[in-house]
């Protein structure tokens, strides 16, 4: 039997809603990733959440039972910092709306993170999720954007899943700045290409499967960069939303849980009902569309 995961050299794994919700691990997820026969497959943890650095993310994953080191983690904060470094002179001031970990990524690429400014506007504004973002933070960023500073958003996720439900995500704060500045940001995270491009470099192969819970970020992002994807129904997107999805948000596979990686996928007729197909094949992924990027 060829397991679904055996078709790929790397798994690009979303975190929130795919591996855990807040501080609660999704049942069976660690065991699914550490099943026998995993050897040789690269696991890359790819998160749109820019609030924590790779070490903190890896420590959290390890505490929950996932095999992870900082080198296995790719964040939207890292991708945002790379975009800034490609566009700005070394040492340029960048107004940070987000956590100290986001500021550290900006500093790490040779730019100067700041929180406030007097006089000349900063060269850029970078915006990532922080539970402590306040009105003064957004106002400072709006002043800079009105003065033509470059604007890079780590991601535009409208919601952030946790153990209580869906909380406002960075996209909700981006929407506030969009309204205040009449500007549009450059976006580093999924569904845009920069974050997944960084993840592919880390994986060392394009024979990679994107695994996530959101049609509008994980799955659309995979389609934009020409990768196969598995939608797991453990987080934000539902089966009803999948039935209504546009072509750009159709996954290659859909499954109820991550354990489907350890079983063969099931091909179904194009007009088959996906819910009924999943019920008839418990624990297995159902093929939604043709594969693009598996090992040939």
In which residue ranges do the predicted regions lie?
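Polytopic endomembrane small-metabolite transporters, centered on the Drug/Metabolite Transporter
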Residues: 76-78
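N-terminal helix-turn-helix
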Residues: 43-44
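Asp-based, Mg2+/Mn2+-dependent phosphohydrolase catalytic module
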Residues: 1-13, 20-39, 50-71, 81-296
């Amino acid at each position: 039997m060829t397991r679904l995961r055996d078709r790929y050299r790397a798994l690009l794994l979303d975190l929130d809603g795919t591996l855990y919700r807040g501080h609660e691990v999704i049942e069976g997820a660690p065991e699914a990733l550490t099943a026998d026969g995993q050897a040789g497959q690269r696991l890359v943890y790819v998160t749109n959440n820019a609030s924590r650095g790779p070490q903190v993310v890896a420590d959290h994953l390890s505490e929950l039972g996932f095999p992870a080191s900082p080198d296995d983690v790719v964040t939207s904060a890292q991708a945002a910092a790379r975009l800034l470094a490609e566009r700005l002179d070394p040492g340029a001031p960048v107004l940070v709306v987000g956590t100290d970990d986001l500021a550290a990524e900006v500093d790490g690429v040779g730019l100067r993170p700041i929180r406030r400014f007097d006089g000349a506007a900063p060269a850029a504004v970078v915006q990532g999720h922080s539970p402590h973002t306040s009105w003064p933070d957004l106002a400072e960023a709006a002043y800079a954007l009105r003065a033509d500073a470059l604007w890079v958003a780590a991601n535009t996720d409208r919601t952030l899943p946790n153990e209580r439900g869906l909380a406002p995500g960075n996209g909700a704060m981006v929407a506030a700045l969009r309204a205040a500045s009449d500007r549009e940001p450059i976006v580093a995270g999924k569904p845009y290409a920069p974050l997944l491009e960084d993840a592919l470099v880390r994986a060392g192969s394009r024979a990679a499967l994107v695994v996530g819970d959101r049609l509008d970020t994980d799955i659309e992002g995979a389609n934009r960069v020409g990768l196969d994807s598995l939608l797991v129904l453990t987080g934000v997107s539902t089966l009803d939303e999948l039935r209504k999805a546009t072509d750009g948000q159709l996954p290659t596979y859909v499954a109820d849980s991550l354990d489907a990686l350890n079983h063969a996928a099931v091909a179904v007729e194009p007009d088959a009902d996906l819910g009924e197909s999943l019920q008839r094949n418990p624990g297995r992924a159902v093929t939604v569309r043709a594969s693009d990027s598996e090992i040939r």
